[in-house]
Regions:
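Hydrophobic transmembrane alpha-helices and immediately adjacent juxtamembrane helices
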Residues: 1-271
C-alpha cells in the first residue's frame, strides 16, 4: 500500500511540477472564471422569473442552478479528457512503454495520471464559485459541505470509468473519439445541466435516468443549495456508486485489453 501511494504521489508531483512552469495559465484561468460567472449571472437576470424559480429544484435562482450545471460540465470534460491527454502525452514522449515494463501496475498508472487534473479542475471550480459568491451573491449559506464532498467523491469515481473507456478507444483507434462527444452532447441536453430534466419529453427523461450526470447534479444541487445531508442523498449517491462499481472494472478490463492488443499489433507508440 505504501508503494502504491508513493507511486501515485510521484505521478501527481510530476504533473504539478510541469504545471508550475506555466504560472500565467493560472492567472488567465482565474480571469476566465470571472467572465464565466459574470456571463451566467447576467443571463440569469435576463431569464429569471418567479415562475421559473418555482420550477427549479430547491426553489432557487436560475443563476445558482445553471452555474452548478456548468461547473459539473467542467468535471465531466475533465473525466473524459484526462485519461486521453495523459495517454497521448506518455505515448508521444516515449514514457508509456517504459512505464509498462516497470513494476507500475495499470491501476496505479491510471489513478496517478488522473489525480492532478482532477485536483486542478476542483481548484478551478472553487475559483468559479468564489467569484460567484463574492461578486454575484451565489448562495452558500445553505451548503452542507460534508455532503458536497461525498457527492464529489462518488461523482469522480463514476465519471472516471467513462474517462478510462474513452482512453481505451484512443489506444485502439488513435485519433478522435466520437463516442465521447456524443456522450457530452447527450449529457448537455438530458443531464439537467442548464434546465430541469422534468421539462424534457418522456423519452429524454428516460435517457436521463441512465446518465450518471443526472444523479450527480441532483445530489450536488441539493447539497450545495439545499443543505441536504448525506443520509437524505442516499438514493443518488447509491446510484452513482452503482455506476462506479459497474464502469470502473469494465473500463479497466477494456483498457488492459486495448493495451495488450496494441502491443501485439505493434501500434502502442504510433499516432
Amino acid at each position: 500500500m505504501t508503494r502504491i501511494l508513493r507511486d501515485i504521489w510521484l505521478f501527481f508531483w510530476r504533473d504539478l511540477s510541469i504545471a508550475r512552469t506555466y504560472r500565467t495559465v493560472f492567472v488567465f484561468e482565474a480571469i476566465e472564471a470571472l467572465f464565466g460567472a459574470a456571463m451566467f449571472y447576467y443571463v440569469a437576470r435576463f431569464v429569471d422569473t418567479p415562475g421559473l424559480q418555482s420550477a427549479l429544484p430547491q426553489g432557487g435562482s436560475y443563476f445558482a442552478f445553471s452555474l452548478v450545471g456548468f461547473v459539473f460540465l467542467d468535471y465531466l470534460n475533465a473525466a473524459l479528457d484526462t485519461y486521453d491527454r495523459s495517454l497521448e502525452e506518455a505515448r508521444d514522449s516515449g514514457t508509456l512503454e517504459h512505464l509498462l515494463v516497470t513494476q507500475t501496475s495499470l491501476p496505479v498508472f491510471v489513478a496517478g495520471s488522473a489525480i492532478y487534473p482532477f485536483v486542478a479542475t476542483t481548484l478551478r471550480i472553487v475559483v468559479y464559485v468564489a467569484w460567484a459568491a463574492i461578486l454575484f451573491h451565489f448562495p452558500l449559506s445553505n451548503a452542507n459541505w460534508l455532503s458536497v464532498f461525498a457527492v464529489l467523491l462518488v461523482t469522480l469515481l463514476a465519471f472516471s470509468g467513462l474517462g478510462i473507456l474513452s482512453a481505451s478507444y484512443l489506444l485502439i483507434f488513435k485519433r478522435g473519439n466520437p463516442a465521447k462527444w456524443f456522450f457530452l452532447g447527450i449529457s448537455s441536453v438530458a443531464g439537467g445541466m442548464l434546465f430541469p430534466v422534468s421539462i424534457l419529453p418522456d423519452w429524454l427523461q428516460l435517457v436521463a435516468r441512465f446518465n450518471p450526470v443526472t444523479y450527480a447534479l441532483e445530489a450536488m444541487r441539493a447539497a450545495l443549495l439545499g443543505d441536504a445531508s448525506v443520509a437524505e442523498l442516499w438514493r443518488p449517491i447509491a446510484i452513482l456508486l452503482l455506476f462506479a462499481v459497474v464502469l470502473l472494472p469494465v473500463s479497466m478490463f477494456t483498457f488492459a485489453w486495448s493495451l495488450r492488443r496494441t502491443k501485439i499489433t505493434g501500434t502502442l507508440t504510433h499516432s
